[in-house]
Protein backbone atom coordinates (compact mmCIF):
# COMPACT_ATOMS: atom_id res chain seq x y z
CA UNK A 1 0.00 0.00 0.00
CA UNK A 2 1.35 3.42 -0.95
CA UNK A 3 1.70 5.85 1.95
CA UNK A 4 0.18 9.29 1.79
CA UNK A 5 3.62 10.67 2.64
CA UNK A 6 4.99 12.46 -0.42
CA UNK A 7 6.94 9.91 -2.41
CA UNK A 8 10.58 10.77 -3.20
CA UNK A 9 9.95 9.37 -6.69
CA UNK A 10 8.41 12.74 -7.51
CA UNK A 11 11.85 14.37 -7.31
CA UNK A 12 14.39 11.50 -7.30
CA UNK A 13 15.26 12.11 -10.99
CA UNK A 14 15.51 15.90 -11.10
CA UNK A 15 15.79 17.82 -14.32
CA UNK A 16 17.44 20.58 -12.30
CA UNK A 17 18.38 21.13 -8.66
CA UNK A 18 20.27 23.69 -6.61
CA UNK A 19 20.15 26.26 -3.82
CA UNK A 20 18.38 29.57 -4.39
CA UNK A 21 16.77 32.26 -2.26
CA UNK A 22 13.00 32.67 -2.12
CA UNK A 23 10.93 35.55 -0.76
CA UNK A 24 8.28 34.57 1.79
CA UNK A 25 4.62 35.09 0.88
CA UNK A 26 3.54 36.43 4.27
CA UNK A 27 6.69 37.70 5.96
CA UNK A 28 8.59 39.21 3.02
CA UNK A 29 12.08 38.09 3.98
CA UNK A 30 14.45 36.09 1.76
CA UNK A 31 15.59 32.61 2.80
CA UNK A 32 17.77 29.95 1.22
CA UNK A 33 15.92 26.90 -0.05
CA UNK A 34 16.90 23.81 -2.00
CA UNK A 35 14.96 23.70 -5.29
CA UNK A 36 14.24 20.71 -7.51
CA UNK A 37 12.44 20.66 -10.85
CA UNK A 38 11.21 17.33 -12.16
CA UNK A 39 8.88 17.13 -15.14
CA UNK A 40 6.15 19.74 -14.57
CA UNK A 41 6.61 20.24 -10.81
CA UNK A 42 8.94 22.41 -8.74
CA UNK A 43 9.64 21.50 -5.11
CA UNK A 44 11.52 23.50 -2.50
CA UNK A 45 12.98 22.25 0.75
CA UNK A 46 13.93 23.85 4.06
CA UNK A 47 17.48 23.23 5.27
CA UNK A 48 18.30 19.50 5.05
CA UNK A 49 14.73 18.26 5.43
CA UNK A 50 13.82 15.34 3.20
CA UNK A 51 10.25 16.55 2.64
CA UNK A 52 9.45 19.65 0.58
CA UNK A 53 7.84 22.64 2.27
CA UNK A 54 6.30 23.71 -1.02
CA UNK A 55 5.19 22.29 -4.36
CA UNK A 56 4.58 24.46 -7.43
CA UNK A 57 2.78 23.15 -10.55
CA UNK A 58 4.70 24.51 -13.54
CA UNK A 59 2.19 23.65 -16.27
CA UNK A 60 1.29 26.89 -18.12
CA UNK A 61 3.47 28.92 -15.73
CA UNK A 62 5.22 32.16 -16.72
CA UNK A 63 8.72 33.22 -15.74
CA UNK A 64 10.63 36.45 -16.32
CA UNK A 65 13.41 38.55 -14.82
CA UNK A 66 12.33 41.09 -12.19
CA UNK A 67 14.65 44.08 -11.69
CA UNK A 68 12.29 45.99 -9.38
CA UNK A 69 13.00 43.93 -6.23
CA UNK A 70 16.22 45.77 -5.40
CA UNK A 71 18.24 42.53 -5.62
CA UNK A 72 20.36 41.12 -8.47
CA UNK A 73 19.55 37.96 -10.44
CA UNK A 74 15.88 37.81 -9.41
CA UNK A 75 13.11 36.22 -11.42
CA UNK A 76 9.37 36.01 -10.99
CA UNK A 77 7.51 32.72 -11.35
CA UNK A 78 3.74 32.84 -11.83
CA UNK A 79 1.87 29.54 -11.40
CA UNK A 80 -1.74 29.89 -12.67
CA UNK A 81 -2.63 26.43 -11.36
CA UNK A 82 -2.42 27.66 -7.77
CA UNK A 83 -2.72 31.37 -8.60
CA UNK A 84 0.55 32.24 -6.84
CA UNK A 85 3.58 34.34 -7.69
CA UNK A 86 7.04 33.40 -6.41
CA UNK A 87 10.07 35.71 -6.26
CA UNK A 88 13.36 33.79 -6.51
CA UNK A 89 16.98 34.95 -6.46
CA UNK A 90 19.87 33.12 -8.13
CA UNK A 91 23.56 33.62 -7.38
CA UNK A 92 24.64 34.71 -10.86
CA UNK A 93 23.01 35.91 -14.11
CA UNK A 94 23.90 32.61 -15.82
CA UNK A 95 22.34 30.59 -13.00
CA UNK A 96 19.19 32.71 -13.18
CA UNK A 97 18.96 32.13 -16.95
CA UNK A 98 19.38 28.37 -16.57
CA UNK A 99 16.65 28.16 -13.90
CA UNK A 100 14.29 30.26 -16.00
CA UNK A 101 14.91 27.92 -18.93
CA UNK A 102 14.16 24.89 -16.71
CA UNK A 103 10.92 26.49 -15.53
CA UNK A 104 9.94 27.21 -19.13
CA UNK A 105 10.58 23.58 -20.03
CA UNK A 106 8.42 22.45 -17.11
CA UNK A 107 5.63 24.80 -18.18
CA UNK A 108 5.49 23.09 -21.56
CA UNK A 109 5.64 19.52 -20.21
CA UNK A 110 3.50 17.50 -22.60
CA UNK A 111 1.75 14.77 -20.61
CA UNK A 112 -2.01 15.09 -20.32
CA UNK A 113 -3.21 16.19 -16.90
CA UNK A 114 -6.61 16.20 -15.27
CA UNK A 115 -8.66 19.41 -15.23
CA UNK A 116 -7.44 21.66 -12.42
CA UNK A 117 -10.66 23.34 -11.30
CA UNK A 118 -12.52 21.22 -8.77
CA UNK A 119 -16.21 20.50 -9.14
CA UNK A 120 -18.47 20.53 -6.12
CA UNK A 121 -19.41 16.89 -6.79
CA UNK A 122 -15.81 15.71 -6.29
CA UNK A 123 -15.61 12.82 -3.86
CA UNK A 124 -12.35 12.59 -1.92
CA UNK A 125 -11.29 8.97 -1.62
CA UNK A 126 -8.06 7.08 -1.18
CA UNK A 127 -7.05 4.28 -3.46
CA UNK A 128 -3.98 2.27 -2.49
CA UNK A 129 -2.96 1.97 -6.12
CA UNK A 130 -3.49 5.53 -7.29
CA UNK A 131 -3.48 7.73 -4.18
CA UNK A 132 -6.28 10.30 -3.92
CA UNK A 133 -9.06 9.69 -6.40
CA UNK A 134 -11.25 12.43 -7.81
CA UNK A 135 -8.64 15.18 -7.34
CA UNK A 136 -6.34 16.85 -9.88
CA UNK A 137 -2.76 15.62 -9.74
CA UNK A 138 -1.49 19.01 -8.55
CA UNK A 139 -3.80 18.93 -5.52
CA UNK A 140 -2.75 15.39 -4.69
CA UNK A 141 0.88 16.50 -4.63
CA UNK A 142 0.08 19.57 -2.53
CA UNK A 143 -1.95 17.53 -0.05
CA UNK A 144 0.93 15.13 0.36
CA UNK A 145 3.58 17.87 0.59
CA UNK A 146 1.47 19.50 3.31
CA UNK A 147 2.11 16.40 5.46
CA UNK A 148 -1.53 15.34 5.21
CA UNK A 149 -1.76 11.71 6.26
CA UNK A 150 -4.10 9.14 4.79
CA UNK A 151 -5.96 8.82 8.08
CA UNK A 152 -6.54 12.58 8.34
CA UNK A 153 -8.24 12.65 4.97
CA UNK A 154 -10.34 9.57 5.71
CA UNK A 155 -11.34 11.01 9.11
CA UNK A 156 -12.50 14.37 7.73
CA UNK A 157 -12.89 14.10 3.93
CA UNK A 158 -15.53 16.83 3.67
CA UNK A 159 -13.41 19.31 5.63
CA UNK A 160 -10.38 18.70 3.43
CA UNK A 161 -12.50 18.99 0.30
CA UNK A 162 -13.90 22.26 1.64
CA UNK A 163 -10.40 23.67 2.00
CA UNK A 164 -9.42 22.48 -1.49
CA UNK A 165 -12.56 23.97 -3.01
CA UNK A 166 -11.83 27.17 -1.12
CA UNK A 167 -8.42 27.41 -2.78
CA UNK A 168 -9.90 26.66 -6.20
CA UNK A 169 -12.57 29.29 -5.52
CA UNK A 170 -9.89 31.87 -4.74
CA UNK A 171 -8.26 31.17 -8.09
CA UNK A 172 -11.54 31.38 -9.94
CA UNK A 173 -12.72 34.56 -8.23
CA UNK A 174 -9.40 36.34 -8.74
CA UNK A 175 -9.58 35.58 -12.45
CA UNK A 176 -13.20 36.74 -12.63
CA UNK A 177 -13.12 40.09 -10.88
CA UNK A 178 -16.51 41.06 -12.28
CA UNK A 179 -18.01 38.80 -9.60
CA UNK A 180 -17.19 41.52 -7.06
CA UNK A 181 -19.83 44.21 -7.32
CA UNK A 182 -19.01 47.90 -7.18
CA UNK A 183 -20.77 50.34 -4.88
CA UNK A 184 -24.54 50.07 -5.40
CA UNK A 185 -25.10 53.59 -6.70
CA UNK A 186 -21.95 53.54 -8.81
CA UNK A 187 -22.14 50.15 -10.54
CA UNK A 188 -21.92 51.80 -13.97
CA UNK A 189 -18.93 53.97 -13.11
CA UNK A 190 -15.55 53.49 -14.74
CA UNK A 191 -12.15 54.52 -13.46
CA UNK A 192 -12.26 57.51 -15.80
CA UNK A 193 -15.33 58.76 -13.93
CA UNK A 194 -13.50 58.67 -10.60
CA UNK A 195 -10.03 60.01 -11.37
CA UNK A 196 -8.74 63.56 -11.79
CA UNK A 197 -7.82 64.60 -15.33
CA UNK A 198 -4.65 66.45 -14.28
CA UNK A 199 -1.18 65.16 -15.14
CA UNK A 200 0.33 63.81 -11.89
CA UNK A 201 3.88 63.97 -13.28
CA UNK A 202 3.56 67.77 -13.14
CA UNK A 203 2.16 67.75 -9.59
CA UNK A 204 4.38 65.26 -7.76
CA UNK A 205 8.15 65.67 -7.71
CA UNK A 206 11.17 63.91 -6.16
CA UNK A 207 9.52 60.50 -6.44
CA UNK A 208 11.33 57.72 -4.57
CA UNK A 209 10.27 54.08 -4.40
CA UNK A 210 9.67 52.90 -0.83
CA UNK A 211 7.86 49.60 -1.26
CA UNK A 212 6.20 47.01 -3.43
CA UNK A 213 3.13 44.85 -2.89
CA UNK A 214 0.95 42.40 -4.77
CA UNK A 215 -1.04 45.23 -6.35
CA UNK A 216 1.81 47.53 -7.37
CA UNK A 217 4.65 49.80 -6.33
CA UNK A 218 4.57 52.54 -3.69
CA UNK A 219 6.52 55.79 -3.89
CA UNK A 220 6.95 58.86 -1.71
CA UNK A 221 6.83 62.21 -3.49
CA UNK A 222 6.43 65.93 -2.82
CA UNK A 223 3.29 67.75 -3.97
CA UNK A 224 4.01 70.99 -5.81
CA UNK A 225 0.64 72.29 -4.60
CA UNK A 226 1.52 72.46 -0.90
CA UNK A 227 5.09 71.11 -0.64
CA UNK A 228 3.86 68.19 1.50
CA UNK A 229 5.03 64.60 1.17
CA UNK A 230 2.50 62.10 -0.17
CA UNK A 231 2.47 58.38 -0.91
CA UNK A 232 1.85 57.36 -4.52
CA UNK A 233 0.62 53.86 -5.30
CA UNK A 234 1.11 52.83 -8.95
CA UNK A 235 -1.09 50.00 -10.23
CA UNK A 236 -1.17 48.52 -13.72
CA UNK A 237 -4.73 48.52 -15.10
CA UNK A 238 -5.93 45.35 -16.82
CA UNK A 239 -9.18 43.54 -17.55
CA UNK A 240 -8.89 41.47 -14.37
CA UNK A 241 -8.61 44.36 -11.92
CA UNK A 242 -10.49 47.26 -13.53
CA UNK A 243 -13.78 46.62 -11.69
CA UNK A 244 -11.99 46.01 -8.40
CA UNK A 245 -10.11 49.29 -8.75
CA UNK A 246 -13.38 51.14 -9.30
CA UNK A 247 -14.69 49.71 -6.02
CA UNK A 248 -11.44 50.47 -4.18
CA UNK A 249 -11.29 54.10 -5.34
CA UNK A 250 -15.01 54.67 -4.74
CA UNK A 251 -14.71 53.35 -1.18
CA UNK A 252 -11.54 55.34 -0.46
CA UNK A 253 -13.08 58.57 -1.77
CA UNK A 254 -16.07 58.18 0.55
CA UNK A 255 -14.23 57.01 3.68
CA UNK A 256 -13.24 59.88 5.95
CA UNK A 257 -11.97 59.03 9.43
CA UNK A 258 -8.99 59.89 11.62
CA UNK A 259 -7.97 56.22 11.67
CA UNK A 260 -8.15 55.65 7.91
CA UNK A 261 -5.31 56.73 5.61
CA UNK A 262 -6.50 59.87 3.84
CA UNK A 263 -7.18 59.57 0.11
CA UNK A 264 -5.97 62.62 -1.85
CA UNK A 265 -6.56 61.93 -5.53
CA UNK A 266 -6.12 59.41 -8.34
CA UNK A 267 -5.01 59.64 -11.95
CA UNK A 268 -4.73 57.48 -15.06
CA UNK A 269 -1.30 57.67 -16.70
CA UNK A 270 -0.70 56.58 -20.30
CA UNK A 271 -4.10 54.79 -20.33
CA UNK A 272 -2.63 51.78 -18.55
CA UNK A 273 -1.50 52.81 -15.07
CA UNK A 274 -3.48 54.08 -12.08
CA UNK A 275 -1.74 56.45 -9.67
CA UNK A 276 -3.37 56.82 -6.26
CA UNK A 277 -2.14 59.69 -4.08
CA UNK A 278 -2.59 59.18 -0.34
CA UNK A 279 -1.48 60.59 2.97
CA UNK A 280 2.14 59.65 3.67
CA UNK A 281 2.59 57.69 6.90
CA UNK A 282 6.18 58.23 8.00
CA UNK A 283 6.22 55.44 10.58
CA UNK A 284 5.87 52.62 8.06
CA UNK A 285 3.52 49.72 8.76
CA UNK A 286 2.88 47.60 11.85
CA UNK A 287 4.74 44.72 10.18
CA UNK A 288 7.97 46.71 10.44
CA UNK A 289 7.70 46.54 14.23
CA UNK A 290 6.78 42.85 14.21
CA UNK A 291 9.75 41.96 12.00
CA UNK A 292 11.97 43.28 14.81
CA UNK A 293 10.18 40.97 17.29
CA UNK A 294 13.39 39.30 18.46
CA UNK A 295 14.63 42.66 19.72
CA UNK A 296 11.43 44.61 20.35
CA UNK A 297 8.32 43.36 22.14
CA UNK A 298 5.03 45.24 22.26
CA UNK A 299 3.62 45.79 25.72
CA UNK A 300 0.00 45.06 26.58
CA UNK A 301 -0.90 48.76 26.69
CA UNK A 302 0.68 49.31 23.27
CA UNK A 303 -1.23 46.37 21.79
CA UNK A 304 -4.42 47.76 23.33
CA UNK A 305 -3.68 51.13 21.71
CA UNK A 306 -3.25 49.67 18.21
CA UNK A 307 -6.38 47.53 18.63
CA UNK A 308 -8.42 50.49 19.89
CA UNK A 309 -7.39 52.75 17.01
CA UNK A 310 -8.09 49.97 14.49
CA UNK A 311 -11.49 49.30 16.06
CA UNK A 312 -12.44 52.97 15.73
CA UNK A 313 -11.82 52.72 11.99
CA UNK A 314 -13.70 49.41 11.74
CA UNK A 315 -16.66 50.82 13.65
CA UNK A 316 -16.85 53.61 11.07
CA UNK A 317 -16.36 51.29 8.07
CA UNK A 318 -18.98 48.85 9.33
CA UNK A 319 -21.44 51.70 10.00
CA UNK A 320 -21.31 52.35 6.24
CA UNK A 321 -22.19 48.66 5.69
CA UNK A 322 -18.73 47.93 4.35
CA UNK A 323 -16.25 45.14 5.09
CA UNK A 324 -12.50 45.64 4.81
CA UNK A 325 -11.71 41.89 4.47
CA UNK A 326 -7.94 42.18 4.78
CA UNK A 327 -7.13 43.37 8.29
CA UNK A 328 -3.53 42.42 9.11
CA UNK A 329 -0.31 44.12 10.19
CA UNK A 330 0.71 44.90 6.59
CA UNK A 331 -2.38 47.09 6.20
CA UNK A 332 -2.00 49.06 9.44
CA UNK A 333 0.10 52.16 8.74
CA UNK A 334 1.78 54.26 11.40
CA UNK A 335 2.48 57.98 11.58
CA UNK A 336 5.89 59.09 12.81
CA UNK A 337 4.09 60.75 15.74
CA UNK A 338 2.41 57.47 16.72
CA UNK A 339 -0.92 57.55 14.89
CA UNK A 340 -2.49 54.28 13.67
CA UNK A 341 -4.53 54.06 10.46
CA UNK A 342 -6.09 51.37 8.25
CA UNK A 343 -4.99 51.26 4.61
CA UNK A 344 -5.52 49.17 1.48
CA UNK A 345 -9.17 48.81 0.51
CA UNK A 346 -8.35 46.50 -2.39
CA UNK A 347 -10.47 43.70 -0.90
CA UNK A 348 -13.18 45.90 0.61
CA UNK A 349 -16.83 45.15 -0.11
CA UNK A 350 -20.03 47.17 0.04
CA UNK A 351 -23.08 45.46 1.52
CA UNK A 352 -26.50 46.45 0.19
CA UNK A 353 -30.10 46.03 1.24
CA UNK A 354 -30.40 43.05 -1.09
CA UNK A 355 -27.01 41.60 -0.20
CA UNK A 356 -26.42 41.98 3.52
CA UNK A 357 -23.99 39.06 3.56
CA UNK A 358 -21.16 38.15 1.19
CA UNK A 359 -19.75 34.81 0.09
CA UNK A 360 -16.87 35.99 -2.09
CA UNK A 361 -13.57 34.36 -1.18
CA UNK A 362 -10.91 37.05 -0.73
CA UNK A 363 -8.32 38.04 1.87
CA UNK A 364 -5.09 36.60 3.24
CA UNK A 365 -5.40 32.94 4.39
CA UNK A 366 -3.70 33.05 7.81
CA UNK A 367 -5.96 35.92 8.91
CA UNK A 368 -9.22 34.54 7.49
CA UNK A 369 -12.32 33.78 9.54
CA UNK A 370 -13.60 30.16 9.48
CA UNK A 371 -16.95 31.12 7.96
CA UNK A 372 -15.15 32.75 5.05
CA UNK A 373 -12.92 29.71 4.42
CA UNK A 374 -15.95 27.39 4.50
CA UNK A 375 -17.65 29.47 1.81
CA UNK A 376 -20.54 30.47 4.07
CA UNK A 377 -22.25 33.83 3.86
CA UNK A 378 -20.43 36.31 6.08
CA UNK A 379 -20.65 39.88 7.30
CA UNK A 380 -18.59 42.55 9.04
CA UNK A 381 -17.48 40.20 11.81
CA UNK A 382 -14.84 38.63 9.56
CA UNK A 383 -12.90 41.83 10.23
CA UNK A 384 -13.18 41.21 13.98
CA UNK A 385 -11.69 37.73 13.57
CA UNK A 386 -8.79 39.18 11.56
CA UNK A 387 -8.27 41.78 14.29
CA UNK A 388 -7.93 38.92 16.79
CA UNK A 389 -5.31 37.28 14.58
CA UNK A 390 -3.50 40.62 14.40
CA UNK A 391 -3.49 40.69 18.22
CA UNK A 392 -1.70 37.35 18.15
CA UNK A 393 0.77 38.82 15.65
CA UNK A 394 1.55 41.63 18.07
CA UNK A 395 1.77 39.29 21.07
CA UNK A 396 3.85 36.53 19.44
CA UNK A 397 5.40 38.05 16.33
CA UNK A 398 3.38 36.13 13.72
CA UNK A 399 -0.11 34.75 13.08
CA UNK A 400 -0.99 31.19 14.19
CA UNK A 401 -0.06 28.14 12.13
CA UNK A 402 2.70 29.98 10.25
CA UNK A 403 4.90 26.90 10.64
CA UNK A 404 2.37 24.88 8.63
CA UNK A 405 1.79 24.96 4.86
CA UNK A 406 -1.19 27.22 3.98
CA UNK A 407 -3.44 24.26 3.13
CA UNK A 408 -3.00 22.67 6.55
CA UNK A 409 -3.32 26.07 8.23
CA UNK A 410 -6.71 26.61 6.57
CA UNK A 411 -7.84 23.16 7.69
CA UNK A 412 -6.75 23.83 11.28
CA UNK A 413 -8.51 27.20 11.36
CA UNK A 414 -11.82 25.65 10.27
CA UNK A 415 -11.65 22.52 12.45
CA UNK A 416 -9.72 23.53 15.56
CA UNK A 417 -9.92 27.30 15.67
CA UNK A 418 -6.94 29.24 16.98
CA UNK A 419 -4.45 27.76 19.47
CA UNK A 420 -4.05 29.46 22.86
CA UNK A 421 -1.35 32.05 23.40
CA UNK A 422 2.05 30.48 24.07
CA UNK A 423 2.65 32.46 27.26
CA UNK A 424 -0.78 32.96 28.76
CA UNK A 425 0.63 34.06 32.13
CA UNK A 426 2.30 37.00 30.40
CA UNK A 427 -1.06 38.54 29.51
CA UNK A 428 -3.80 39.87 31.78
CA UNK A 429 -7.19 38.16 32.09
CA UNK A 430 -8.69 41.24 30.44
CA UNK A 431 -6.38 40.82 27.44
CA UNK A 432 -7.18 37.12 27.16
CA UNK A 433 -10.93 37.67 27.42
CA UNK A 434 -10.88 40.31 24.66
CA UNK A 435 -8.68 38.08 22.50
CA UNK A 436 -10.96 35.04 22.88
CA UNK A 437 -14.06 37.10 22.05
CA UNK A 438 -12.54 38.28 18.76
CA UNK A 439 -11.75 34.68 17.81
CA UNK A 440 -15.05 33.06 18.73
CA UNK A 441 -15.81 30.52 15.98
CA UNK A 442 -19.53 31.09 16.59
CA UNK A 443 -20.23 34.23 14.55
CA UNK A 444 -23.36 35.04 16.54
CA UNK A 445 -21.31 35.21 19.74
CA UNK A 446 -18.47 37.24 18.23
CA UNK A 447 -18.89 40.90 19.27
CA UNK A 448 -18.96 43.77 16.80
CA UNK A 449 -16.64 46.78 16.84
CA UNK A 450 -18.99 48.91 18.94
CA UNK A 451 -19.24 46.26 21.66
CA UNK A 452 -15.49 45.66 21.71
CA UNK A 453 -14.75 49.36 22.14
CA UNK A 454 -16.66 49.11 25.44
CA UNK A 455 -14.56 46.19 26.66
CA UNK A 456 -12.33 46.86 29.73
CA UNK A 457 -9.25 45.98 27.67
CA UNK A 458 -9.69 49.26 25.81
CA UNK A 459 -9.21 51.16 29.07
CA UNK A 460 -5.64 49.85 29.19
CA UNK A 461 -4.64 51.51 25.92
CA UNK A 462 -1.74 53.95 26.07
CA UNK A 463 -1.70 57.13 23.99
CA UNK A 464 0.30 57.93 20.84
CA UNK A 465 3.19 59.44 22.83
CA UNK A 466 3.79 56.07 24.51
CA UNK A 467 3.57 54.23 21.20
CA UNK A 468 5.89 56.57 19.27
CA UNK A 469 9.13 55.25 20.87
CA UNK A 470 8.31 51.75 19.60
CA UNK A 471 8.21 53.04 16.01
CA UNK A 472 11.55 54.78 16.47
CA UNK A 473 13.11 51.69 18.08
CA UNK A 474 12.03 49.46 15.16
CA UNK A 475 13.75 51.82 12.72
CA UNK A 476 17.02 51.47 14.58
CA UNK A 477 17.10 47.66 14.63
Curated annotation (Swiss-Prot):
Instruction: Provide the alphabetized UniProt keywords.
Output: ATP-binding, Chemotaxis, Cytoplasm, Kinase, Magnesium, Membrane, Metal-binding, Nucleotide-binding, Serine/threonine-protein kinase, Transferase
Kindly state which reaction or reactions the protein catalyses.
L-seryl-[protein] + ATP = O-phospho-L-seryl-[protein] + ADP + H(+); L-threonyl-[protein] + ATP = O-phospho-L-threonyl-[protein] + ADP + H(+)
Query: Transferase as a keyword?
Result: yes
Keyword Transcription regulation tagged: no
Enumerate the SMART domains for this protein: PBD, PH, S_TKc
Active site residues of this protein: 326 (proton acceptor)
The entry marks the following residues as binding ATP, namely 210-218, 233
Q: List the disulfide bonds.
A: none
Q: Where in the cell is it found?
A: Cytoplasm; Membrane
Q: What is the effect of changing residue 33 to C?
A: Low basal kinase activity, loss of response to chemoattractant, reduction of cell polarity and production of multiple lateral pseudopodia
Enzyme Commission number(s): 2.7.11.1
Record-annotated PH domain positions: 13-108
What mutagenesis or variant effect is reported for residue 143 to F? High basal kinase activity but retains response to chemoattractant
Q: Which residues form the Protein kinase domain?
A: 204-458
First-listed, main subcellular location of the protein, grouped into a coarse class: cytoplasm
**Family statement drawn from the similarity comment of this UniProt entry:** Belongs to the protein kinase superfamily. STE Ser/Thr protein kinase family. STE20 subfamily.
Q: What does this protein do?
A: Has role in the regulation of chemotaxis.
What protein name is recorded for this chain?
Answer: Serine/threonine-protein kinase pakC
Phylogenetic placement of the source organism: Eukaryota, Amoebozoa, Evosea, Eumycetozoa, Dictyostelia
Question: What gene, per UniProt, encodes this protein?
Answer: pakC
